[in-house]
């Protein structure tokens, strides 16, 4: 696994020279591609440089120990050798993880879908809670979080479903572990006997697709317009600005009502539809791989119960990795980074074990 590190370092230097060329920015498509490759390799090269530096220090210290006569100096050198030896395994592990094949979709933006499941009005309120949790997490990450479409429930403040666009750095690579069924246990405000009710919401995280990723024929689409309930000034409920697009071969539907014009809503609905079709395409490719890993973390199985939010115990438990926190209020305020980091680490460990078999 370490054999190609030197060639990676040489490629990184080549890219640095190419990007420094004043003519490089002339072709923006090529420039962005080179810049992304440079960024992807930088962390590997920097970690490898630290590793090489420590290995050199270790070699020098061992040589010094052989020639040193002073006992106090020998003791100091032995301490230094011990400390350097402690650092090497962690760096080796870090390099192995960095060398794992990257999921090309990780750098993409996301279409996030949250839908109320079992539990009636309480499920709709929980869907809103999840919406706000992800909105606050996106703000902390510096991402752009934009509502695309929603269906309100009969209970004030509740969503039957919501569709959101999230754009920023490595959004899919961070959010992909959220796909699945989220279960909540709490006492509803309307419950007079104090009984705990269980309800659920499903989350789907779809990587945003480019036009080149998915071929969509115009004749396969049905476009319907309707009156928007969203923003739009005087147009609201007067002009049919909202758009619903149906992909006839698959039955996939995408709708948008949040923009002010029908054209803008159509563009966003097409973006949502491309993401849905691209997600099907990616799932088929993954299923076809001989090395398909069958863990829920890896597959993002949306029918799988992945997490429980227990309000009486102020507890959040992720069932895939056995992670538990008793800081539920903070978690619902978007403090979900610790869990996402743990899920990433678990995924990397599994992939590393598979690569070494």
From Swiss-Prot:
Task: State the GO CC annotations.
Answer: cytoplasm
Which domain of life does the UniProt lineage start with? Answer: Bacteria
Q: Which SUPFAM superfamilies match?
A: Release factor
Name the InterPro entries on file.
PCRF (IPR005139), Pep_chain_release_fac_I (IPR000352), Pep_chain_release_fac_I_sf (IPR045853), Prokaryotic/Mito_RF (IPR050057), RF-1 (IPR004373)
Keyword Cytoplasm among UniProt keywords: yes
Q: Which family does it belong to?
A: Belongs to the prokaryotic/mitochondrial release factor family.
Entry function: Peptide chain release factor 1 directs the termination of translation in response to the peptide chain termination codons UAG and UAA.
Q: Which GO terms describe its molecular function?
A: translation release factor activity, codon specific
Which cellular compartments is it found in? Cytoplasm
- N5-methylglutamine occurs at 234
User: What's the protein called, per UniProt?
Assistant: Peptide chain release factor 1
HAMAP family on file: Rel_fac_1 (MF_00093)
User: What is the predominant subcellular site recorded for this chain?
Assistant: cytoplasm
Question: What does the UniProt PTM comment say about this protein?
Answer: Methylated by PrmC. Methylation increases the termination efficiency of RF1.
The record lists the organism as: Chlorobium phaeovibrioides (strain DSM 265 / 1930) (Prosthecochloris vibrioformis (strain DSM 265))
Pfam name, any one: RF-1
Q: Which UniProt keywords apply?
A: Cytoplasm, Methylation, Protein biosynthesis
């Amino acid at each position: 696994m370490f054999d190609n590190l030197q060639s990676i370092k040489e490629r990184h230097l080549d890219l640095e020279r190419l990007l420094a060329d004043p003519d490089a920015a002339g072709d923006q498509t090529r420039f962005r591609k080179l810049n992304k490759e440079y960024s992807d390799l930088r962390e590997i090269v920097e970690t490898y440089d630290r590793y090489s530096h420590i290995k050199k220090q270790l070699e020098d210290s061992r040589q010094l120990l052989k020639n040193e006569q002073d006992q106090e100096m020998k003791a100091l050198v032995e301490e230094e050798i011990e400390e350097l030896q402690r650092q090497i395994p962690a760096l080796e592990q870090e390099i192995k993880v960095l060398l794992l094949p990257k999921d090309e979709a990780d750098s993409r933006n996301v279409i996030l879908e949250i839908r109320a499941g079992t539990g009636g009005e309480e499920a709709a309120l929980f869907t809103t809670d999840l919406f706000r949790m992800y909105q606050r997490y996106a703000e902390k990450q510096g991402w752009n979080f934009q509502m695309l479409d929603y269906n309100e429930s009969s209970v004030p403040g509740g969503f039957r479903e919501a569709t959101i666009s999230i754009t920023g750095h490595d959004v899919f690579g961070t959010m992909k572990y959220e796909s699945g069924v989220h279960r909540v246990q709490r006492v509803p405000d309307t419950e007079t006997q104090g009984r705990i009710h269980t309800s659920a919401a499903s989350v789907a995280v779809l990587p945003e697709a480019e036009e080149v990723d998915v071929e969509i024929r115009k004749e396969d689409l049905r476009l319907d317009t309707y009156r928007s309930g969203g923003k739009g000034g005087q147009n609201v409920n007067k002009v049919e600005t909202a758009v619903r697009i149906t992909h006839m071969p698959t039955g996939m539907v995408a709708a948008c009502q949040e923009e002010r014009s029908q054209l803008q809503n159509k563009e966003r609905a097409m973006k949502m539809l491309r993401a849905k079709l691209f997600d099907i395409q990616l799932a088929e490719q993954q299923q076809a791989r001989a090395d398909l890993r069958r863990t829920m973390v890896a597959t993002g199985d949306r029918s799988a119960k992945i997490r429980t939010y227990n309000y009486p115990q102020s507890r959040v438990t992720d069932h895939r990795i056995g992670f538990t926190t008793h800081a539920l209020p903070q978690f619902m305020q978007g403090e979900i980074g610790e869990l996402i980091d743990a899920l990433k680490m678990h995924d990397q460990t599994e992939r590393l074990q598979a690569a070494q078999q």
